[in-house]
Amino acid sequence: MLELDRINTFRGPAHVLNGVSLTVRDAESVVLVGRNGAGKTTTIDSIMGLLPVRSGTITFNGTDISRLPTHQRALAGIGYAPEDAGIFPDLTVVENFLISQSLARAAGKAAPTAGDSGIDERVLTLFPEVRAFTKRRGLFLSGGQKKMVAIARAMTLSPTILLLDEPFEGLAPVVVTRFIEAVTRIKAMGVSLLIAESNLMTASRVADRLYAIDRGEIIFEGEPRRAFENEEVMKTIRG
C-alpha cells in the first residue's frame, strides 16, 4: 500500500502541495483528478523522489520512503511513466527497453523473457502494437506510441504499483479506449495504479476511487460517481 500523509512540496519558492494525504491500496486503481496546475504532477514527482517533500511522509508497504533516492523507490516496486513519456529519442524502442531490462537484472529481479523482438514478452502483451516499430528511434514515434513504450517499459521492473502521469492526454478517443484496456489488464495482474488525469469522465472509466485536487489541496475523495454529484469538484474541473 502507498500512503501520503500531509505532504508539503515546493517547486523553487512556490508552495505547490499543501498537506496532501492519499492512499492507494493493493491492486486498486486510484485517479488523482484536477485541472492543469492543480498539483497532480507534483504529487507524482514527490512520490518518485523527483521533488523532495518539505514535510509529511510517504510510506510504501510499511516503509517510510520520503528520503529515498528515486532509483531506490523504483527498485522497491514503484513504476513510473511520465507525462512526456521519457523516451530516449536517439535510441530505438528495443534499446529503450534493454536499459530497463538490464536494470531489472542488476536489481535481482526476475529476468525478463525476451522474444524475437528482444523485448520482455510479458509487457508486450499490454501493447502488441509495439512489435511493429521496435526498431524505430524514439525521435520518430508518435505521441501515442511513446506513451505505449513508456507504460510497457515501466512494467519491466515488475512494479507492485504504477504511477501514470496524464497517460491519456492528447490521444484520440479510440486510442484512449485502447489505453484503458491496457490499464485494466495491468490491474488484473495485481498491480496498483495511481493515475494523474485532468478529464473527470476519463478518470471515472478507470478509477476504483478518485481524489480531486485543486491548488495543491485534496478537495474530494470517494467513488467516481460521487464526484459528479459534488458541486465543488465539478466547478473546479470545469475551471
Predicted feature descriptions by range:
Residues 33-35:
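The feature captures the beta-strand-to-loop junction immediately N-terminal to the Walker
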Residues 48:
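Helix-to-loop junction immediately C-terminal to a conserved catalytic motif
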Residues 154-155:
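ABC ATPase C-loop
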Residues 162-166:
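Catalytic Walker B motif of ABC-type/P-loop ATPase nucleotide-binding domains
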